[in-house]
């Protein structure tokens, strides 16, 4: 049996009275990769020992470019992450300067935002090109970290980012702490109407029970008002200007605020509009479209290029809103 971490399947098979082997040849910690599996198979006698270079050596010879995890095309989290970056996380003196490299902490200006993140698809915003997040610890930690930074006297404006299912799971008590301790942290709840990262499970906010039956959905708006937050905002996940203006206002407030950014996960709803395309006559090669981190966007002939087979089209449209030249339009093909 080849399995990562604990020998769960191995032990279950052994309980059936079947002779089984596994952890004698494969590690109980860490992540499996082709080289580890190959070595284990050789030790088990499944594969012959080979004089050829190991898989790791052969792969390294290919010198493949790194491919970090990416958001899906049409992900409702992209606009919020892009907005947090564009609002001046690392360069608050300008809303248009989008440096490609992450600056060292010593270079962070005091007026910049600090963004504490949580566990979910939105955690991918820590990677380039977005580089929008500062912390990730465990489920529900983002809100407590944000309040802790505020109460410790950190001069920066602080925003906590958390998903809808994670907020219901372990974020509510953190929000209560903000209200109870008279904090003024802004909490952004990214509501994609599912638990996407672990397989699109439903949660109390979706109105579908664990058995798949319709039930009463928990209203996030009513919930956060119920714990004492007066400044509650709901914005579309695909309205870039609305997201940016709401965040800008809330972080300047002297009371707690919650922004619910709502938009369905495209992998669940499976809806799309007309694919978008780049008008090469209008494109000035500023590559602002690349900085939203959408895998449907690349470069062709020094101009932005959108892969129509990946683009969810006008049902998203974040790239067209980010383009200052209005060069991204609906495809005519």
Protein language model features and the residues they cover:
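Short Fe-S-cluster ligation motifs
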Residues: 98-106, 310-329
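Flexible loop/turn segments at secondary-structure boundaries
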Residues: 6-10, 29, 79-80, 122-126, ...
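Terminal amphipathic helices with adjacent charged low-complexity linkers/tails
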Residues: 1-52, 328, 333
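Active-site diphosphate/adenylate-binding microenvironment
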Residues: 52-142, 152
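General beta-strand structural signal in soluble alpha/beta enzymes
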Residues: 1-3, 20-23, 50-54, 114-118, ...
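Iron-sulfur cluster-binding cysteine motifs and their immediate structural context
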Residues: 12, 284-305, 316-333
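Glycine/aspartate-rich loop-and-adjacent alpha/beta segment that forms the canonical ThDP
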Residues: 8-15, 249-299
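Thiamine diphosphate
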Residues: 124-260, 271
């Amino acid at each position: 049996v080849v399995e990562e971490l604990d020998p769960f399947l191995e032990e279950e098979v052994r309980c059936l009275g079947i002779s089984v082997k596994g952890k004698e040849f494969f590690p109980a910690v860490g992540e499996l990769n082709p080289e580890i599996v190959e070595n284990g198979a050789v030790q088990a006698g499944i594969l012959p020992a080979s004089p050829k270079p190991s898989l790791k050596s052969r792969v390294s010879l290919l010198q493949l470019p790194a491919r970090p995890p990416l958001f899906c095309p049409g992900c409702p989290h992209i606009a919020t992450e892009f907005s947090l970056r564009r609002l001046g996380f690392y360069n608050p003196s300008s809303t248009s300067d989008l440096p490609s490299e992450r600056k060292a902490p010593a270079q962070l200006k005091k007026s910049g935002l600090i963004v504490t993140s949580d566990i979910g698809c939105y955690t991918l915003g820590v990677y380039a090109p977005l580089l929008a997040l500062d912390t990730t610890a465990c489920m529900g930690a983002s809100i407590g970290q944000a309040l802790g930074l505020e109460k410790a006297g950190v001069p920066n404006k602080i925003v906590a980012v958390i998903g809808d299912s994670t907020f219901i799971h372990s974020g509510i008590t953190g929000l209560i702490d903000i209200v109870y301790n008279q904090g003024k942290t802004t909490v952004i709840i990214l509501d994609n109407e599912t638990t996407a990262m672990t397989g699109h499970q439903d949660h109390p906010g979706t109105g579908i029970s664990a058995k798949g039956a319709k039930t009463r959905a928990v209203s996030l708006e009513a919930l956060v008002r119920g714990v004492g937050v007066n400044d509650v905002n709901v914005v579309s996940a695909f309205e870039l200007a609305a997201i940016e203006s709401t965040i800008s206002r809330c972080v300047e407030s002297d009371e707690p605020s919650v922004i619910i950014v709502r938009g369905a996960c495209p992998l669940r709803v499976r809806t799309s509009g007309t694919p978008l395309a780049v008008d090469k006559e209008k494109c000035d090669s500023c590559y602002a479209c690349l900085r939203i981190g959408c895998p449907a966007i690349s470069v062709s002939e020094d101009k932005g290029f959108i892969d129509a087979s990946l683009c969810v089209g006008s049902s998203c449209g974040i790239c067209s809103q980010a383009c200052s030249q209005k060069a991204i339009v609906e495809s005519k093909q």
